[in-house]
Every structure is written in C-alpha cells, then in structure tokens.
Amino acid sequence: MWFKNLTLYRFNKPFVVETEALETALADFTFSPCSSQDISKFGFSNALGKKGSSLVHSANNRHLICVTKEEKMLPGQVIKEALEEKVALIEDEENRKLAKKEKDALKDEIITSLLPRAFSRRSQTRALILPELEMILVDSSSATKAEELLALLRKALGSLPVIPLSFKAPVESHLTEWLKNGSAPLPFEMQDEAELKSEADEGGIVRFKQQDLKEDEVLAHLATGKQVHKLALHFGQSIALLLQSDASVKRLKFSEEFRAGNDEVGTDDPMARLDADFALMGSELVALMHALVSALGGLEETQD
C-alpha cells in the first residue's frame, strides 16, 4: 500500500463526495477477470487489496482507491507469423492476392482463436484523493496509467474536473537554483543524484549519481546553460524521492524508521495495521505536498 511514485493532479473545483457515495459510484465499475474471449479488463478493486473489503478506504477525509487491469499477453510476432502462414495458404489455394480488409479479418480470427490459450497479467494502480488539498495523488510512474485511472473515476462520478499539477514558475528553474546554491529549502535536503539537460534542441544530457553535487564538475554544467530536470531529495527524516521537472515524483520511499511507527499496531489484526499505515502515509504525503508547493513557489492559478 505504501506509494512508490506520485503523478500529481489538482481539482479545478472543490471535491465534495462522502465515502459512501464514492463507494456506490465505484461499485458500478468493479473489476472482473477476463473471460476466454476478453483481451483486457479494467475496473475498481478493493482499496487495501486482498485483506480489504471496500472499494474506498477513508480516514480523516482522505480516500484511497485502486484499479486493477488484466491483459492477455499475445506476442505480436506470434500473430504476425500465424497471419503470414494463413494468408500464404489462401493466396496459394485461390491463386490471388488478399485485400487488406481480408487480411484484417483473418488477423481478428487468429486473435480470437489464441485468446483462450493466452496467459494474462494483472497490474494495480492506487490513488489518494485529498479534498483538503484539492489534489489527487496517483501511485504510478506512468502518466498513461494515471490517466486511465482518472478516466474510469470520471466515468463513475459523471465528472472529474482535474488537471496536472503546475507551478507558477517551471520546476526546473527551482531545481537549478537549489543546485547552484548547494542546498534545497528546508525541510528538503539534496542528495547525490541529478540529471541536467541543455535547453538547446541539440543539447546534451548529463547524469550524476552517487556524487557530491556541490563539486565544480557538476556546477560547470550549469555555467553552460544546462538546467536540472531531476534531483534526488530527502523530505525530513521520513521520505526519499526523485523530483522531476514535470512535477512528478519517482522512487518515493518511506524510511524504515518512519514506517516502524506502527510496529505495535495490529500484531493480531492485519486490517488494523493497514488502517494505521494508511493514516500514517496519508498524513506524511499531505505534509510533503504542503512543503513541495511552498518550495516550488506556489501553484499556477487555475482558469475557471
């Protein structure tokens, strides 16, 4: 349940919905496994996984939701070879070239015949709805997966006025300034990893890892006009993260010491531990968002 990435969105309008109403809305779009002829299925599932019993898990007006996606694995090369074999056979028997429309129909037939025997894979994506911040945090490093979750949530609710998080000034300008100054604003602390890019179309990319970012070798690249597009940070003593210029957060990791705060909870009740972990994570992510917005100079004004 602990989030590992953050793709960030904000509401254009206040999000007002009670847990029960949200649960009811999501119930019409619950996940069901692929049948023999389904190529994929997508829907809401228990927010807390197998141990959970509800599509929405809420605490302190913070709502956790989860989507599950199942996809049949049909290698393109297998389909291509089967199609070529079938086309060659028919063209040889009928002594003519098949039209594109006929080949497309054959391809559909081949896919249909392969689906019942195909392996499938499942993936889950969670999101944290924070009405107090008017934000949604999606636990995904993929903007596409985040948008898929939001699209289904929008379908369930009827509307979902959200936009990607954006700031008054480009994120890279702040990251570059922090690197020049040798420190990030408290409670953030720079670590030993960064990626710098030239703003020129044909410019280069330089990556530093496990290196003192205050060294002249690093700063020399700033003098040539490169800007920082990725920067490793610590948030207090609780979270390590990689902040990117698109305002997304990768490699989010809560420290063992922080997570140990709930070690005495739920030794005999796994659900109690999950509930406590959710409350702990939610509170710290809210604190992280407050600090991030402040450090990056505030959010861009939304247009009504």
From Swiss-Prot:
Localization per record: Cytoplasm, Nucleoid
Gene Ontology biological process terms, A to Z: DNA recombination; regulation of DNA recombination
Keyword Nucleus: no
GO cellular component: bacterial nucleoid; cytoplasm
Gene Ontology MF annotations: double-stranded DNA binding
Keyword Cytoplasm: yes
Family to which the UniProt record says this protein belongs: Belongs to the RdgC family.
Function: May be involved in recombination.
Name used for this protein in its record: Recombination-associated protein RdgC
Species the sequence originates in: Shewanella putrefaciens (strain CN-32 / ATCC BAA-453)
